[in-house]
Amino acid sequence: MKNVLDTIKRVKEMGLWLEVVTLVVPGFNDTSEELWETARFLASVSPEIPWHVTAFHSDYKMSDTDDTPASTLLRAAEIGREAGLHYVYAGNLPGRVDEYETTFCPKCNTALVKRTGYRIHKVTVTPQGTCPQCGSAIAGVWSAFQAPDITGSPASNP
């Protein structure tokens, strides 16, 4: 684990974009103590590191372990926010993890990217990577970002 933590620190020090995903597995790493430890570590490196907590599904070779309930992901996400992380997401349980599918401005709490699962419904971050409401810089790689076509219209075939 030390190598993983050192790599997270190095990647951030190098100025590269980094997001961390934690697969929360019941009985393995789902205690509040373990989640707090992870969240505090990430916040100590940078509160702008996005942390995705995702649910385990008992498939394939680990079918004897329970699926991660939405309540556990919500608890993990709340711990992340309380630890000081600005961008915390609870993933892979679409529609069951409340506001933890949405990106909010850490300064004014404006909803910036609204999602359900992996589907983006609305993006309001400016092309310069700022909040349209308060002008705060939003962590991310926005220079290459193009807002998706979320109108539902089919793409044209040239």
Show which residues each predicted segment covers.
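Short cysteine-rich clusters marking metal-coordination/redox-active sites
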Residues: 105-108, 131-134
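Short cysteine/histidine-rich metal-coordination sites, predominantly Zn2+-binding motifs
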Residues: 120-132, 146-157
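Short, non-ligating residues that shape and space the ligands of small metal-coordination modules
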Residues: 114-115, 140-141
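Conserved AdoMet/S-adenosylmethionine-binding subsite of the radical SAM
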Residues: 1-71
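Cys/His-rich metal-chelating microdomains
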Residues: 111, 137
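Short alpha-helix
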Residues: 70-80
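Residues immediately within or flanking Cys/His clusters that coordinate Zn2+
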Residues: 100-102, 128
